[in-house]
Amino acid sequence: MAHPHLLAERISRLSSSLEKGLYERSHAIRLCLLAALSGESVFLLGPPGIAKSLIARRLKFAFQNARAFEYLMTRFSTPEEVFGPLSIQALKDEGRYERLTSGYLPEAEIVFLDEIWKAGPAILNTLLTAINERQFRNGALVEKIPMRLLVAASNELPEADSSLEALYDRMLIRLWLDKVQDKANFRSMLTSQQDENDNPVPASLQITDEEYERWQKEIGEITLPDHVFELIFMLRQQLDKLPDAPYVSDRRWKKAIRLLQASAFFSGRSAVAPVDLILLKDCLWYDAQSLNLIQQQIDVLMTGHAWQQQGMLTRLGAIVQRHLQLQQQQSDKTALTVIRLGGIFSRRQQYQLPVNVTASTLTLLLQKPLKLHDMEVVHISFERSALEQWLSKGGEIRGKLNGIGFAQKLNLEVDSAQHLVVRDVSLQGSTLALPGSSAEGLPGEIKQQLEELESDWRKQHALFSEQQKCLFIPGDWLGRIEASLQDVGAQIRQAQQC
């Protein structure tokens, strides 16, 4: 086979050629190309006149010798119009029931069926066999059909609990298309003089029959690593828990895995990577509601688990808690002592913060943990300005418990030693202390754990950087993943500077 990276570059150039003159249809072209390269079916949902049929016609040019068939379904469509007319001569001379399939679906590599849900039962039943088994029963013969890509289109979804459900389930990739939105793209589309039926693909990029057949075998050799399977299973389990999640058949999961293998193969990789799982957003939805739900769940998977983001944050939280415990052991030496002011003519004693306390946000440690607002609290973050106002004028004081969430109302007082004391609902108190001096540096135990965590983060970020070169994944998804990893890295570095 060709070098994996050369193959990935070729497929990228092929896709770019197919996309010429089609505005805001890059993702649709790329996924239809991936479907064609892996022998799958695509459903395009959208209003009339948005280039659904043109997308299918373009895909024919990806192959050197591909034949195309397209048909607009109506309630009156007959099997003869899709699968070919009966041979009168064969019926008359030999009594054989045989169709003349030349120029019809049974002999086409690329098939486009518009308004698919208007097809009658006779067409649908034959079409199901064609999709499932790549076979067509022509009289007494069962003929193998060469179909590589079926693109079905409609401006509506099939009715629930209808006879169309079986066919809809066979359409692995489902894309929701709309009109051209961007102003510049709309202008370019209006003024374009390109003939939409011209072949935009250089012959050197077109795929031969031999290459296509060889690639089908090689796609099946792409491995599914354990950690990627665990992500898929996590997604499946999460969907099973949600009451509004769509039903996803085992058959659809199975076919989706082959699509992920194809994505990895044509991206120059020997194994499915977490980034390939983003394709599931176009495979698992059923209707508008489930489309949003699936995207949300995959977003959580990609930005929280696929590169161990949440796991690393959990580890970081444990390290920070341990660091605070070590600091609490030194807190008696660092208890915050406020300065008492004169207040001769004041009804309330006034205080101020020591001059060496200058941070805009103060993190104060509890000498012993307390349960505040149903949370085990070991430290509280105060806005300096709010704390100064409370010391001077009294009133309400709020702070963030363990430094997270919204600031909560606190029962805070100054004791006789001029220390700040926070109390729980049972009036048990805990003195607040400043963290240990930064000059002391991080304890060796904490420093080592943070260095190990940073090393793991670098490995995960490097893995993502290697895997993100995937033609079939939209750039905005890659941007969100990168942002999630950078956020984890920033929190680790911040902890190292404490």
UniProtKB/Swiss-Prot annotation:
It is found in: Cytoplasm. It catalyses: ATP + H2O = ADP + phosphate + H(+). The keyword Membrane does not apply. ATPase activity is stimulated by ViaA. GO terms for cellular component: cytoplasm. Gene3D superfamilies: 1.20.58.1510, 2.40.128.430, P-loop containing nucleotide triphosphate hydrolases. SMART domains: AAA (SM00382). Its main location: cytoplasm. Pfam families: AAA_lid_8, ATPase_RavA_C, bpMoxR, LARA_dom. CDD domains: AAA (cd00009). ADP binds at Y23, G49, I50, A51, K52, S53, L54, E196. GO terms for molecular function: ATP binding; ATP hydrolysis activity. Its EC number is 3.6.1.-. Keywords: ATP-binding, Chaperone, Cytoplasm, Hydrolase, Nucleotide-binding. PANTHER family: ATPASE RAVA. Homohexamer. Interacts with ViaA. Component of the RavA-ViaA chaperone complex, which may act on the membrane to optimize the function of some of the respiratory chains. RavA functions as an ATPase. Belongs to the RavA family. This is Regulatory ATPase RavA. The gene is ravA.
